[in-house]
């Protein structure tokens, strides 16, 4: 059944502007955006939603999600996580490759696409994981299938860590797609872990987590990734930066090299480990 809906007098955020206006939806398509308060649309609506005082935003694109499908579905599936995304106003997601098995070949990518086509309630894309085995072939990756390359320069879930310097150079040289990178200096972290285990036993208290994985480990690795991106003229996006020291490495006007932050790193500080413990622990 054909239906026209008017969302009126909302605070609309769109294309770099914020203004009071109304939106006309014809079935499932946006037909008209009207600037101004109480402005009537060209055709009468079937239903009206008064959104005065509320913000109206376009669907959010989340370019860093971990839907855990396949292989880790006790944590989530394309259906459960895309349902949560839709409920939060996220209409497009780009999923990470550290699943089981990891998404590092065309065959595994196609399997993942098929899973998402069957289950996802929102638009989706995928990152291909960079490894020593596929580094020399990244130039041949089909941009219609892959949104970008995910590179783990630090240890995380999925056994996808790459630290070998020649391999890192090959990845940046071969990739014609944007590279998203997880930046941590693992040797520095391992040395700190050894030091703290010698001091405090095999299971150091979580309060020491920010000292075992220090900001310096992130800064050092991030500087290396930025230098490689500049050398090979590759678009780079640094994932989940955690400190002001990292933020200082980026120019907000430079669209070639960008970064993101996660909400926990904005909401909590090192002192909160005493109160909240492992609930806020994150590499």
Task: Please annotate each region the language model reported.
Residues 1-42:
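N-terminal metal-binding scaffold of metallo-dependent hydrolase/deaminase domains
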Residues 10, 23, 28, 53, ...:
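Divalent metal-coordination and catalytic microenvironments
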Residues 39-56:
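Active-site metal-binding motif and surrounding structural segment of the metallo-beta-lactamase
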Residues 54-119:
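Metal-associated gating/positioning segment near the N- to mid-region
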Residues 63-76, 99, 122-134, 211-215, ...:
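Active-site mouth loops of central-metabolism enzymes
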Residues 90-94, 119-123, 226-235:
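Short, surface-exposed connector motifs at secondary-structure boundaries
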Residues 106-122, 170-181:
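Alpha-helix-loop-beta-strand connector modules within alpha/beta enzyme cores
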Residues 136-283:
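Histidine/acidic residue-rich metal-binding segments in metalloenzymes
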């Amino acid at each position: 059944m054909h239906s026209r809906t008017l969302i009126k007098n909302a605070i609309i955020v769109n294309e770099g502007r914020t203004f009071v206006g109304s939106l006309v939806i014809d079935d499932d398509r946006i037909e008209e955006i009207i600037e101004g308060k109480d402005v009537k649309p060209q055709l009468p609506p079937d239903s009206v939603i008064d959104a005065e005082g509320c913000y109206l935003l376009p669907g959010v694109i989340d370019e860093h999600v971990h839907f855990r499908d396949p292989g880790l579905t006790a944590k989530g599936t394309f259906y459960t996580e895309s349902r949560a995304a839709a409920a939060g106003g996220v209409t497009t997601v780009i999923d990470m490759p550290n699943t089981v098995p990891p998404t590092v070949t065309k065959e595994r990518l196609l399997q993942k696409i098929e899973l998402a086509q069957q289950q996802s309630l929102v638009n989706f894309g995928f990152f291909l994981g960079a490894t020593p085995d596929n580094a020399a072939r990244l130039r041949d990756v089909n941009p219609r299938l892959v949104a970008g390359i995910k590179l783990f320069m630090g240890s995380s879930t999925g056994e996808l860590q790459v630290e070998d310097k020649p391999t890192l150079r090959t990845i940046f040289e071969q990739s014609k797609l944007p590279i998203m990178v997880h930046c941590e200096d693992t040797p520095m972290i391992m040395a700190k872990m050894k030091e703290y285990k010698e001091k405090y036993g095999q299971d150091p208290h979580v309060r020491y987590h920010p000292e075992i994985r220090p900001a310096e480990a992130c800064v050092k690795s991030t500087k290396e990734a930025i230098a490689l991106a500049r050398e090979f003229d590759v678009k780079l996006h640094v994932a989940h930066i955690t400190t002001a020291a990292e933020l200082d490495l980026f120019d907000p006007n430079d669209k070639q090299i960008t970064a993101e932050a996660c909400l926990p790193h904005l909401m909590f500080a090192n002192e909160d480990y005493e109160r909240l413990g492992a609930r806020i622990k994150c590499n």
